[in-house]
């Protein structure tokens, strides 16, 4: 059996999942990558090639016939070629009593004195014990392979990160990487599919099996579909033979579920205060009917600003960046949609922030202290981040912060919904809101923005930004639809 460094990545990305690794090993087809995922793959190759261009003359092993790449790599190392691109290593060993062939393909081998540095190029901005463990394990496996084949350790292991910096990765002799490969081997040797709980943030993060796994979980009424049942709790319940919401409700009262310990990090933790809510979610998932807990607490105003941001995560941009600040007043005196967009030049981020402050100030001038209604904490967090980044000279951002109304906790305190997630996209569909765009979503919008940034065609850029603006405008309309639905409860 062949085990590769890519198997470790499959185990971790987009989120940790042993079932994905198993299905890939079984040859089960995945859905096509999203537009965003395809763009990120392209950007990753561009990032890698740009770094390669800084390294001088190199030998490209990927141009060699596949069955000759391992021997060509070793010969090139022996000949002390300055830079070896896309090297390939293979080494037969025994892991957990099984004979396996371990394969690794580091991006760069860079001669430094008499020894080689092993370096991989990644878009990730941070690589350490707390960020992207799989990258460190990948490099450690390359280091172990190099040592077995060459006979001496590599000079160092490094990552060329998304910031352009080069970070060192500690080498432990390959112990951690080989231990992880033992986990990989155990999954690949399974004769039946391993149990994996589904989860909204886990499975909707870009996994190619989400449609397959979600449909199967719904068909078997898996307990992991119950809101607030985290991955550790789902695994614990499943191992105890409790696999459905019905079994959960019939097996536990609040106190007993509260006392149940489930895996949590390296140890265990009681379910605790979440037990009551979990049982409520289980009950409504069985009945399919929502449950009113308390009056909906929304402050009375004539008008409300629906407020939504579109941003790029730090792994895809030099800084975590909001590229669109969307606002629209609804109520007795509605406004047109307002989209404050960051510029495409070097100072575009600041331009977008200033445009938002100007637009928000105009709203306050016309409407007074009007609530800015949003969904979840993204807006509050990022306003605070931008105040630290660029300041708030006239106090407009501080005023927005004072007037923020997060509709998510308002909803959760008032109503238990028979849904697997309180994501706005899920709740808006539940209340009957319909969108007009065939394609939409945060990842889709990021893909459009990246394409708009990369193109020199002004017409194409404007068309893509127009689609993003339309998506954001419908996000605001969806928030208002949920808001109105809540007020009628």
Which residues are covered by each model-predicted region?
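Structural signature of nuclease core domains in nucleic-acid processing machines
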Residues: 112, 116-118, 122-124, 297-479, ...
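Cys/His-rich metal-chelating microdomains
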Residues: 20, 210, 378
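Metal-dependent nuclease catalytic cores that hydrolyze phosphodiester bonds in DNA/RNA
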Residues: 1-114
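Mg2+/Mn2+-dependent nuclease catalytic core
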Residues: 82-182, 321-322, 326, 331, ...
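Short, amphipathic alpha-helical segments that act as regulatory/interfacial helices
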Residues: 48, 52, 56, 143, ...
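C-terminal extensions
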Residues: 213-329, 338-339, 349
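Metal-dependent nuclease catalytic regions and adjoining charged, substrate-binding loops involved
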Residues: 126-133, 145-218, 363-366, 386-402, ...
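Short linear loop/turn motifs
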Residues: 67-71, 250-254, 264, 439-451
């Amino acid at each position: 059996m062949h085990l590769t460094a890519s198997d470790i990545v499959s185990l971790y990305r987009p989120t940790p999942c042993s079932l994905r690794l198993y299905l890939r090993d079984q040859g089960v087809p995945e859905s096509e990558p999203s537009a965003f995922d395809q763009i990120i793959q392209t950007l990753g190759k561009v990032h890698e090639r740009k770094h390669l261009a800084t390294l001088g003359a190199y030998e490209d092993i990927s141009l060699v016939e596949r069955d000759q790449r391992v021997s060509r790599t070793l010969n090139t190392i022996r000949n002390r070629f300055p830079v070896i691109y896309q090297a390939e290593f293979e080494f037969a060993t025994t892991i957990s009593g099984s004979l396996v062939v371990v394969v690794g393909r580091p991006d760069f081998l860079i001669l430094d004195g008499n020894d080689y540095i092993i370096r991989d190029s990644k878009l990730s901005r941070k690589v350490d014990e707390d960020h992207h463990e799989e990258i460190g394990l990948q490099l450690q496996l390359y280091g172990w392979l190099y040592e077995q084949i060459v006979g001496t350790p590599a000079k160092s292991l490094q990552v060329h990160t998304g910031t352009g910096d080069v970070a060192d990765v500690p080498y432990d002799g390959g112990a951690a990487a080989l231990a992880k490969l033992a986990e990989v081997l155990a999954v690949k040797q399974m004769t039946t599919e391993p149990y994996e709980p589904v989860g909204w943030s886990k499975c909707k993060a870009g996994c190619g099996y989400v449609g397959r796994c979600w449909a199967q979980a719904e068909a078997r009424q898996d307990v992991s579909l119950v809101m607030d049942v985290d991955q550790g709790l789902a695994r614990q319940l499943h191992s105890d033979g409790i696999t459905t919401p019905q079994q959960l409700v019939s097996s536990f009262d609040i106190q007993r579920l509260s006392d149940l310990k489930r895996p949590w990090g390296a140890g265990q933790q009681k379910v605790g205060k979440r037990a009551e809510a979990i049982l409520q979610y289980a009950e409504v998932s069985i009945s399919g009917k929502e449950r009113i807990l308390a009056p909906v607490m929304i402050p009375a105003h004539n008008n409300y600003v629906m407020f939504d941001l579109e941003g790029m995560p730090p792994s895809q941009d030099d800084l975590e960046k909001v590229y669109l600040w969307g606002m629209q007043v609804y109520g007795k005196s509605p406004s047109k949609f307002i989209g404050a967009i960051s510029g495409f030049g070097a100072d575009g981020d600041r331009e977008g922030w200033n445009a938002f402050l100007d637009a928000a100030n105009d709203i306050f001038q016309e409407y007074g202290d009007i609530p800015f209604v949003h969904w979840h904490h993204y807006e509050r967090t990022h306003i605070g981040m931008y105040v630290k980044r660029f300041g708030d000279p006239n106090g407009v951002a501080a005023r927005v912060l004072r007037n923020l109304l997060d509709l998510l906790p308002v909803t959760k305190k008032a109503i238990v919904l028979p849904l697997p997630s309180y994501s706005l996209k899920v709740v808006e569909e539940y209340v009957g809101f319909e969108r007009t765009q065939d394609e939409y979503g945060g990842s889709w919008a990021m893909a459009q923005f990246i394409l708009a940034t990369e193109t020199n065609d002004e017409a194409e850029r404007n068309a893509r930004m127009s689609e993003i603006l339309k998506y954001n405008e419908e996000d605001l309309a969806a928030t208002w639809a949920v808001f109105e639905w809540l007020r009628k409860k």
